[in-house]
UniProtKB/Swiss-Prot annotation:
Disulfide bridges in this chain: C35-C60, C37-C56, C45-C80
One BP term from GO: suppression of blood coagulation in another organism
Site entry (Reactive bond), positions: L39, I40
Subcellular localization, as worded in the UniProt entry: Secreted
Protein source organism: Anopheles gambiae (African malaria mosquito)
Signal peptide: 1-26
InterPro entries noted in UniProt: Kazal_dom, Kazal_dom_sf, Serpin
Record's note on what induces expression: (Microbial infection) Up-regulated in salivary gland following infection with Plasmodium falciparum.
Function in brief: Functions as a slow and tight inhibitor of host neutrophil elastase (ELANE). Inhibits host proteinase 3 (PRTN3) and chymotrypsin. Does not inhibit other host proteases involved in coagulation or inflammation, such as cathepsin G (CTSG), trypsin, chymase, matriptase, beta-tryptase, kallikrein, urokinase-type plasminogen activator (PLAU), coagulation factors Xa (F10), XIa (F11), XIIa (F12), plasmin (PLG), thrombin (F2) and tissue-type plasminogen activator (PLAT). Inhibits host neutrophil chemotaxis induced by N-formylmethionine-leucyl-phenylalanine (fMLP) in vitro.
Superkingdom as given in the UniProt entry: Eukaryota
Keywords assigned: Blood coagulation cascade inhibiting toxin, Disulfide bond, Glycoprotein, Hemostasis impairing toxin, Platelet aggregation inhibiting toxin, Protease inhibitor, Secreted, Serine protease inhibitor, Signal, Toxin
One Pfam family from the record: Kazal_1
Protein name: Agaphelin
Subunit composition and interactions: Interacts with human ELANE.
Length: 84
């Protein structure tokens, strides 16, 4: 029973995250298939005003063709919150 509830919660979270993906982020995410980052939530704000779950994920995104073309880099620790 607990496993079903947990699985349902994870499924709902994945659907919500998929619906919030922007076109530029979708390009970067589709290029990041080979990255292996730990599932640690320590958000960082990037130069594209997107929050990444941790520095490893941001580094991975910055090394994609799209990330390199836009000069993706860390701006600050924490979520972006639409600050710029």
């Amino acid at each position: 029973m607990k496993m079903r509830v947990h699985l349902l919660a994870v499924s709902v979270l994945l659907v919500v995250l998929a619906l919030q993906t922007t076109p530029a982020e979708a390009d970067i995410n589709s290029e990041m298939a080979t990255c292996a980052c730990q599932l640690i939530y320590r958000p960082v704000c990037a130069s594209n005003n997107e929050s990444y779950s941790n520095e490893c994920v941001l580094k991975c995104a910055s090394e994609t063709p799209t990330g390199r073309s836009i000069g993706l880099h860390k701006v600050k620790d924490g979520n972006c919150n639409g600050e710029f």
